[in-house]
């Protein structure tokens, strides 16, 4: 799952698509309208393919081959042996090579699809109050924040309200650091409004207790850090008590880097021009081993790929392991933009499969024909699921161009994107359930070949 621009103000259950991508939500809906023909064709194809009962019982010999313990070995390799693998790093390439080797070993035609993306990393963040040196501040640089000058900067702090243009007309902001509340606007808009008013940096604090993190989506003109609700209130109190200056030192890397989508293709014997995509993102956030987010999804996809290696399928099945999902769904955006002729009939997205009791079959705003088929198949297999609306993962880019999707997702993991996302928390039994359902969906949608 991606980092939110502002989780508090998301209008859907998880991270808002317009908050983690470069396109606003209205552009997404416009794209969906533009691609209506693509959607209708894909839905009609799926309707024909899925009209008959799946006959899950007839697939039981294949489903019985699924092994959660075997899938768990991939989690160990990716999250424990390799560890955190942020897009654009050497560990990222190591994880890509591991996945490519697994696919090649099982007979898939493997492609490395390279693309560039805006890489961001934090080297150092320090916030101090020279007049109160004993206070400890846990500031976090927001994604795509630029650096301060070497050695940092010291300036007075002024309140900037919610960061709206009118909030900066009530006090002298030029040359100061703006203290801004979370809410109402996207973080990037708050930062740009502060910069336009003359602020040299911005501090955005949570309006609820606890820390927060977020993304500016793209670089802005001034350094931006976040504070917890408690620390934000403390700093605001110092400002109101007579004014305060702070020293802020932010050192980040903002540059274009290269990563890859790893693609494994198994051609269909009856209708090879129709393609079912099975996707899972393979990158992590910094400092997170990524056992559940998303080594678990990669492991489930690799397990399904291994089972299918000797099976003749009617349509082509393509396993795509996306890069730079955590940076803003860049890998799936690139893949969809270069997919070409509209041959994709559906997409199964696997993200966070190893922790939590609830399993969702989800879409975002597009057709739910594949999600409903997945729910039917799950019922035949005796797997409890709920149909939901979820965004914040790679299926959204497929829905953007009208491809029916189903997102298999376990939402109840409070430790994802943290250093505590470790292999001991991933349950092999849950991997087996997700892999069995994903395999049944693939077999039901692609059909058996000659």
Model-derived features: positions:
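Bacterial N-terminal signal peptides
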Residues: 41-51
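Second-shell loop/turn segments in exported
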Residues: 59-65, 80-93, 159, 179-185, ...
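Noncatalytic luminal/extracellular "stalk/propeptide" segments of secretory-pathway proteins
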Residues: 61-68, 73-177, 252
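Extracellular/luminal Protease-associated
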Residues: 89, 137-229, 381-384
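Alpha-helical metal-binding/catalytic segments enriched in His/Glu/Asp
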Residues: 103, 202, 262, 274, ...
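Metal-dependent peptidase/peptidase-like ectodomains
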Residues: 134-136, 286, 312-313, 322-413
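Soluble metallo-hydrolase cores and metallopeptidase-like ectodomains found primarily
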Residues: 138-169, 217-291, 306, 314-316
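His/Asp/Glu-rich mid-to-C-terminal helical/loop segments that flank catalytic regions of hydrolases
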Residues: 414-450
């Amino acid at each position: 799952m991606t980092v939110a621009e502002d989780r508090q103000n998301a209008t859907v259950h998880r991270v808002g698509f317009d908050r983690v991508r470069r396109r606003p939500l209205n552009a997404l809906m416009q794209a969906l309208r533009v691609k209506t023909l693509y959607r209708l064709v894909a839905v009609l194809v799926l309707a024909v393919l899925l009209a008959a009962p799946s006959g899950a019982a007839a697939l039981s010999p294949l489903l019985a081959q699924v092994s959660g313990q075997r899938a768990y070995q991939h989690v160990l390799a990716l999250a424990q042996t390799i560890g955190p693998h942020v897009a654009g790093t050497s560990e990222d390439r190591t994880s890509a090579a591991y996945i490519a080797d697994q696919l090649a070993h099982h007979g898939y035609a493997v492609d490395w699809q390279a693309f560039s993306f805006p890489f961001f990393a934090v080297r150092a963040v320090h916030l101090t109050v020279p007049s109160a040196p004993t206070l400890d501040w846990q500031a976090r640089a927001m994604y795509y924040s630029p650096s301060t000058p070497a050695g940092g900067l010291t300036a007075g702090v002024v309140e900037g309200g919610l960061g709206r243009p009118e909030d900066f007309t009530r006090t002298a902001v030029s040359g100061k650091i703006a203290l801004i509340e979370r809410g109402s606007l996207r973080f990037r808009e708050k930062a740009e409004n502060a910069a336009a008013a003359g602020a040299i940096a911005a501090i955005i604090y949570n309006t609820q207790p606890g820390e927060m993190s977020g993304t500016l989506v793209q670089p802005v003109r001034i350094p931006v850090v976040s504070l917890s609700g408690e620390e934000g209130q403390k700093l605001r109190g110092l400002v109101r008590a007579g004014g305060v200056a702070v020293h802020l030192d932010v050192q980040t890397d903002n540059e274009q880097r290269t990563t890859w989508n790893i693609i494994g293709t198994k051609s269909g014997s009856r209708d090879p021009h129709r393609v079912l995509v099975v996707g899972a993102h393979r990158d992590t956030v910094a400092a997170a081993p990524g056992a559940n987010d998303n080594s678990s999804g990669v492991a489930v996809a690799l397990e399904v790929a291994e089972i299918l290696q000797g099976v003749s399928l009617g349509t082509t099945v393509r396993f795509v392991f996306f890069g730079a999902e955590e940076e803003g769904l860049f890998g799936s955006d690139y893949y969809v933009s270069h997919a070409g002729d509209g041959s994709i009939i559906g997409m199964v997205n696997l993200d966070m499969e190893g922790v939590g009791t609830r399993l969702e079959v989800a879409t975002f705003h597009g057709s739910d024909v594949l999600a409903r088929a997945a729910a039917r198949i799950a019922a035949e297999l005796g797997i409890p699921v709920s149909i939901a609306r979820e965004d914040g993962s790679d299926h959204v880019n497929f829905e953007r161009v009208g491809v029916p999707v189903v997102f298999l997702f376990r939402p109840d993991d409070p430790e994802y994107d943290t250093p505590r996302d470790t292999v001991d928390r991933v349950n092999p039994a849950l991997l087996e359930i997700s892999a069995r359902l994903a395999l049944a969906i693939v077999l039901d949608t692609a059909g058996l070949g000659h």
